[in-house]
């Protein structure tokens, strides 16, 4: 049901300029005079993204890309957190079924340099969702040159080079992992130890609560412009999975305060979900016995 919405375009320029994290970069780099190499490469990549099946869109995980209707180098992206209940063999993740918004700007030297990417889902700068996802939105990823490891590869005669899609998939698969605590440099050696695993559970506990607040409740309250239909459809279709996941998270909460916080968030979330069901003509489910 979500497939036709995977790639789309919308107007991102408002009366006061672009409503985008990289609005200054956009203003400083007008389309007039944009290098042909950048435009040619972007045209190729966006054409591929628009092809059915190019972007991963499933209940387990999804990536939705929105380009500006006037500028192909201005993008917004929603990445859904990998769903715990649907991929048990890969382990639990604390991001399950949440929607995380990223802003992307493609600089003039592209594809010789990587795109610029910033996370917008941060609870207004209060939440660091991962050692690689800062509360100011910085994304630490080797492809972006902001983390150790193999960096961005410009295209050559024998290699097509790195792509925007690779960046987005890497965020979902390399950063949004079951145990993000161990992404922190120096903490990896603790993995498998009783103390390290306990710290990881406590870390995930806080992230689960933050995911419910900001990537589910707040996303439903204020869906990003252009993504409204995707957000509504995502949470309406996946409500049963979301509520089963929430019940499990509440049962596994490491502290009473976290458990109570999740229950409060669900109390605020339920009317929003009921409203989606009512608008779609669905039967509103009975209250989930979380506690």
Q: What kind of feature is each model-predicted range?
A:
Residues 1-97, 109-291:
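UBC/E2-like fold recognition across ubiquitin and ubiquitin-like conjugation systems
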């Amino acid at each position: 049901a979500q497939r036709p919405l995977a790639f789309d375009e919308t107007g991102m320029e408002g009366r006061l300029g672009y409503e985008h994290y990289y609005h200054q970069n956009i203003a400083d780099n007008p389309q007039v005079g944009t290098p042909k190499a950048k435009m040619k490469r972007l045209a190729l990549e966006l054409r591929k993204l628009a092809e059915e099946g190019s972007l991963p869109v499933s209940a387990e995980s999804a990536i939705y890309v929105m380009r500006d209707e006037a500028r192909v180098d201005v993008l917004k992206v929603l990445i859904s957190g990998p769903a715990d209940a649907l991929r048990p063999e890969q382990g639990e993740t604390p991001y399950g079924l949440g929607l995380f918004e990223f802003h992307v700007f493609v600089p003039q030297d592209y594809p010789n340099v990587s795109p610029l990417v910033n996370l917008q889902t941060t609870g207004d700068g209060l939440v660091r969702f991962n050692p690689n996802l800062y509360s100011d939105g910085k994304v630490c990823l080797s492809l972006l040159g902001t983390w150790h490891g193999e960096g961005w590869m410009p295209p050559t005669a024998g290699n097509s080079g790195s792509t925007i899609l690779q960046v987005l998939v890497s965020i979902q698969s390399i950063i949004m992992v079951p145990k993000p605590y161990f992404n922190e440099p120096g903490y990896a050696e603790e993995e498998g130890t009783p103390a390290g695993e306990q710290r990881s559970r406590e870390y995930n506990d806080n992230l689960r609560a933050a995911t419910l607040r900001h990537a589910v409740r707040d996303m439903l309250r204020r869906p990003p412009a252009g993504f409204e239909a995707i957000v509504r459809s995502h949470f309406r279709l996946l409500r049963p999975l979301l509520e089963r996941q929430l019940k499990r998270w509440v049962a596994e909460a490491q502290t009473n305060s976290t458990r109570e916080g999740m229950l409060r968030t669900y109390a605020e979330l339920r009317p929003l979900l009921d409203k989606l069901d009512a608008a779609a003509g669905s039967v509103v489910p009975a209250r989930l016995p979380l506690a």
